[in-house]
Curated annotation (Swiss-Prot):
E.C. number(s) listed in UniProt: 7.3.2.2
Residues given in the record as ATP binding sites: 40-47
Localization, UniProt: Cell inner membrane
Family, per entry: Belongs to the ABC transporter superfamily. Phosphonates importer (TC 3.A.1.9.1) family.
InterPro entries (UniProt xref): AAA+_ATPase (IPR003593), ABC_transporter-like_ATP-bd (IPR003439), ABC_transporter-like_CS (IPR017871), P-loop_NTPase (IPR027417)
UniProt topology in membrane: Peripheral membrane protein
Gene3D superfamilies with a match to the protein in the record: P-loop containing nucleotide triphosphate hydrolases
Entry keyword Aminoacyl-tRNA synthetase: no
Function of the molecule: Part of the ABC transporter complex PhnCDE involved in phosphonates import. Responsible for energy coupling to the transport system.
Pfam families: ABC_tran
Name of the top EC class for this enzyme: translocase
Record's protein name: Phosphonates import ATP-binding protein PhnC 2
Length: 277
């Protein structure tokens, strides 16, 4: 799916009048089938950007086109059909606690199924082999018939990612998919996700705190800070200097990044601000 953002600003519905928009005057073009990672410090607007692309938030200014269509100019039925081609995997997947994992995974197909098929699948999953393959891709194939409330946080996160594999989405949006995973499982999860997107020709947009993982597995990196695009570059062109500027006052979020040497970090510690009440 193609993406085109032109002068986009987004204000959260709950924001106070006059508040600074969560996203400001963003321009971004993504080709169909492209894979990119969005990085930046906490509060940069990464999750807001994904919700915008998922048509969950309406822009307050500018325009957004998905496959040359403005979602907010479509009829309700056409918008629902467009949303069926999108898949958003939030950082904490909304999995019903008493549901079996197989049912939770196959819910990734619901936007493209009839009402009757959707209701039937809640009680009689119809493609168990598909769910098992998707779970196996994230090393949780043995959890197929477990209840969701018996899974660890990392297992739940991988079940949420397995949903993306069974969906028919042409735009896959993934928010911090590695936050509950150890380094080995993080590596495997990203490889599974990027390979699956490439095989089906889907566009993949992922927000990542793991900068080193983003640079290693995504050909294009978008740096976001204070609701604006700081840089949009091939991964090979993202330098330690750019990362320093992007994460200024948030350098602790770059801890462990191999290509950011100790000499690159500032020698003077940032001032500590204490709030008393």
């Amino acid at each position: 799916m193609k993406i085109s953002l032109n002068g986009i600003s987004v204000q959260h519905p709950s924001a106070k009048p006059g508040a600074v928009p969560a996203l400001r005057e963003q321009n971004l073009t993504v080709r169909a089938g492209e894979q990119l990672a969005i990085i930046g410090p906490s509060g940069a607007g990464k999750t807001t950007l994904l919700h915008l692309l998922a048509c969950a938030l309406k822009p307050s200014a500018g325009s957004m086109l998905l496959n040359d269509q403005d979602p907010w100019q479509l009829s309700r039925g056409a918008l629902q059909k467009l949303r069926g081609a999108l898949f958003l995997a939030p950082q904490v997947p909304p999995l019903p606690p008493r549901q079996r994992v197989v049912t939770a995974v196959l819910a990734g197909r619901l936007p493209n199924e009839s009402l009757w098929a959707s209701l039937r699948s809640l009680f009689y999953p119809t493609d168990i082999a598909l769910a098992e393959r998707a779970l196996a891709g994230f090393d949780v194939g043995d959890k197929l018939f477990d209840r969701v409330d018996r899974l660890s946080g990392g297992e739940r996160q991988r079940v949420g990612l397995a949903r993306a594999l069974v969906s028919q989405a042409s735009l896959i949006l993934v928010d911090e998919p590695l936050s509950a995973l150890d380094p080995t499982r993080s590596q495997h999860a990203i490889e599974t996700l990027t390979r699956a997107a490439q095989e089906r020709g889907a566009t993949l947009v992922a927000t990542l705190h793991h900068v080193e993982m983003a640079l290693a597995h995504f050909p294009r990196i978008v740096g976001l800070r204070d609701g604006q695009v700081a840089f949009d570059l091939p991964a090979a062109e993202v330098t330690p200097e750019l990362l320093q500027a992007l994460y200024a006052q948030h350098l602790h979020e770059l801890t462990g990044l191999a290509n950011l040497e100790a000499d690159d970090l500032p020698t003077d510690p940032a001032p500590v601000v204490m709030h008393c009440r």
